[in-house]
């Protein structure tokens, strides 16, 4: 017997959490036959809330801090983790989850919107650690290797998704700041030796204040600082509202308020206040007194209207109606329900919203549900040009053809909270005019900015070891796939210049003989890669953390119709492996449909792909030959599932997530029964393959019979496990066959 190995499968949120109820027992049953124990770790939003407040709970209600435990595990050489998408909670999502837990008898405290006492401040601090992208930075102890697997790419070529045609006279464009933003104010320094730096604000009267405790830096670490001017931002936003009206296009704002949980909600709030300026000019005081905070979106104002007296409320509503009439039309998230692009910060996430718009002829939906040309407002100009270059390319050359286009895999710098995505704990809304300085332990001023009240100042860190690992990964991928690799770096940008010095030094240490490796500024890199993509050629994008995020949505959505079908591997720096299931989110709309119609359209293809590479990694690390057989047969089963079109469909009564899990089980069992590499597995799975083959029609009928009516799983953020499991296993015949295994 080989020694038992462990794979950790994360329990997360929304659609992937429901899918886990169905898929995980199948995976555990198969893995058991290869001496592999598949355990779960609960890193869901509700699980993380409960773990943060043990002293508020009874002994029986307490849960371990699974995220902290996983954060330690990923530093071990034997780590093997399958990571599903989780919620990056905005304040509205966080408060909804808290309310749900409280209604179930968990006495967790309320989220203090305006903490006054020390206790409230301590509670708020704990909740703020759960907010935003709180999971990925803890687990991502490696860089990112994301690509479309051959089977998926071939399927997309044979079964192309819809692509909206582009008109040569499309008025769609990106609007971004030309000065006063983070990009134009960036400074960057590489520290030669380990030190710590203080971030000190000095006001006009000379009063000094440390904005946080000192930040420890390692030798060779790159630090950057930048500031966005509030004055410049407000002027820019007002200009764009006017310009959208003049051009007759929709106004839309594209931010990432979930991940960039300090800076982007502030920017979002300014956009709401500028768009609805007359409302705030006339009623700002009364709205503030009613608890309105539009950093949580315009929806927050609507939700608090009932706190106003009847006359004020009527006046505010009339003013809102007048603004809608006078201003450009807003892009809509849900035109039927009147939900605009400015209602909820977590509804429009730039990396998903921009590719969706580009795929839809460069259009978003107006209040009547009609597609219209759009002004896409992306205030900070660091990466906005990549989207403008893509729009220009489509306007000139027309839409891409999924049947002939190439692919753009990504190697992303991500480890140890690199760059902007690690900046939240070093991001501050400045309270008064003055200066912010970054000062090292010896008292040297490394960077300094003049700042104004309301400006957003931030510092980022990029450690040396992750950069070295990233360059190595890029060279490995270029060689293994025999594909040109482009570093998307702008030598005129301070941070990129610092990074480039390291990239050149580390490339010189590696064998790059015969490889095509180049460095291009992001817009040029985009044009180069888009040109090759249209010609059916492949190009690896080698990028920093933000572009990793943006491009692994942009290119897959154009190539495959979704980013959930990506292979997303995180080779951990200490030798373990983390396998992320796709590059998409947790699909709240899928859950909404499931609760209303008992039809879950979530596609678990990302999980199937991640499982196969997880088994393969385990086989290579431990010499477990059975794990390799599981990997190979799972890949074959996944390909068969795609070719036979057994992925979930959109409408109730059709095959859904549970049906696709049945077909995966059927094909996987058939492949195991047919293979000759491992006799034990062959014998073990032959009866299951026979039973499922015989009962296929009956099982599919049982799975579709339950659809078309509402289902109760006892919660949203914290569903009742028994009810959810029951809902996700509606076929008695399938359950029986699995149990026999």
Regions found by a protein language model. Name each.
Residues 2-269, 278-502, 506, 510-658, ...:
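Extended, well-ordered protein cores
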Residues 619-622, 672-676, 703-706:
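Secondary-structure edge/capping motif, primarily at the C-terminal ends of alpha-helices
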Residues 644, 648-659, 687, 709-713, ...:
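Terminal, compositionally biased segments used for targeting/anchoring and flexible tails
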Residues 682-690:
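Short, charged, amphipathic alpha-helical segments
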Residues 700-717:
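A glycine-biased, small/acidic residue-tolerant capping/turn segment at secondary-structure junctions
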Residues 719-741:
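C-terminal accessory extensions/subdomains outside the catalytic/core fold
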